[in-house]
């Protein structure tokens, strides 16, 4: 399986993803990897309906995403992975899914999180997950839109003296 793009965007499929990122990815399908979304039938249905024209969308559990990645039947597939958080990415990478670059595009503010950029808010567990991904060799590309300059999220955390 060839991963053409892996992106964290907690809105999952929305305007930027359907009009820009899906073209950047140039993949045959979008695979949304998240247990909570997989277990929410209404959300799963809505996300499939929001698919960009001509692109298949699958919403799968992390376990299924890892199994499909390792299945030789899908070795010629090109995929665009969408995640809601770095913890799910870390789980998959630890199970042998080879993600070279992770684009971080949107992580909404919630209680307990601090705003790093307009589109990305983090808590200490998120930062730790990004550090682990970095140690595992995953390039961390903080970009909301494709035309933004690429910035390593850990550099941004360090330069802004972002407190954990």
Curated annotation (Swiss-Prot):
Residues 1-164 form the PTS EIIB type-4 domain. The keyword Calcium does not apply. Its main location: cytoplasm. It catalyses: keto-L-sorbose(out) + N(pros)-phospho-L-histidyl-[protein] = L-sorbose 1-phosphate(in) + L-histidyl-[protein]. The active site is at residue 14. GO terms for cellular component: cytoplasm. InterPro entries: PTS_IIB_sorbose-sp, PTS_IIB_sorbose-sp_sf, PTS_IIB_sorbose-sp_subgr. Signal peptide: none annotated. It is found in: Cytoplasm. The keyword Membrane does not apply. One of its GO terms (molecular function) is protein-N(PI)-phosphohistidine-sorbose phosphotransferase system transporter activity. Its EC number is 2.7.1.206. Gene3D superfamilies: Phosphotransferase system, sorbose subfamily IIB component. PROSITE patterns: PTS_EIIB_TYPE_4. Pfam families: PTSIIB_sorb. GO terms for biological process: phosphoenolpyruvate-dependent sugar phosphotransferase system. The modification Phosphohistidine is found at residue 14. It comes from the Bacteria. Keywords: Cytoplasm, Kinase, Phosphoprotein, Phosphotransferase system, Sugar transport, Transferase, Transport. Dimer of dimers. The PTS EIIB type-4 domain is phosphorylated by phospho-EIIA on a histidyl residue. Then, it transfers the phosphoryl group to the sugar substrate concomitantly with the sugar uptake processed by the PTS EIIC type-4 domain. The phosphoenolpyruvate-dependent sugar phosphotransferase system (PTS), a major carbohydrate active transport system, catalyzes the phosphorylation of incoming sugar substrates concomitant with their translocation across the cell membrane. The enzyme II SorABFM PTS system is involved in L-sorbose transport. This is PTS system sorbose-specific EIIB component. It comes from Klebsiella pneumoniae.
